[in-house]
A protein has these predicted regions:
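Structural marker of alpha-solenoid helical repeat scaffolds
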Residues: 17, 76-77
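Canonical positions in the second alpha-helix
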Residues: 13-14, 73
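TPR alpha-solenoid repeat register
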Residues: 24, 83-84
Length: 106
């Protein structure tokens, strides 16, 4: 069973104690990212549907929640590309953040 909310709560508590804990930043970002991916996977693709568009906004909001934590992890551990690159790429692509996307591709 996926317990994203529990993971989010626990890692937020860790970050209150030590905001620079790179692993806690990574896992909090990853929780939000995976929660967004899982929610997105439940949607029936219909770009003309108002409900679909609203639900895609929810996915993007989860990605927006994930982004600062994954970026903080990236700044702390730039050589750990295999952990931060794919999630950030997907987030930047989904949120249409072309400048950030280009920086990842450099």
């Amino acid at each position: 069973m996926k317990e994203y909310d529990k993971c989010i709560s626990n890692t937020e508590n860790l970050l209150r104690i030590n905001p620079n804990n790179s692993d806690a930043n990574y896992y909090l970002g990853l929780c939000w990212y995976n929660k967004g991916l899982d929610y997105d996977a439940t949607l029936i693709p219909d770009p003309t549907s108002k409900t679909y568009k609203e639900n895609k906004k929810k996915v993007n909001q989860m990605f927006e929640q994930a982004m600062p934590y994954l970026e903080k992890f990236r700044a702390a551990r730039p050589d750990d590309k295999e952990r931060w690159q794919a999630p950030l790429y997907r987030i930047y692509f989904s949120l249409n953040l072309s400048d950030q996307l280009k920086k990842l591709e450099e």
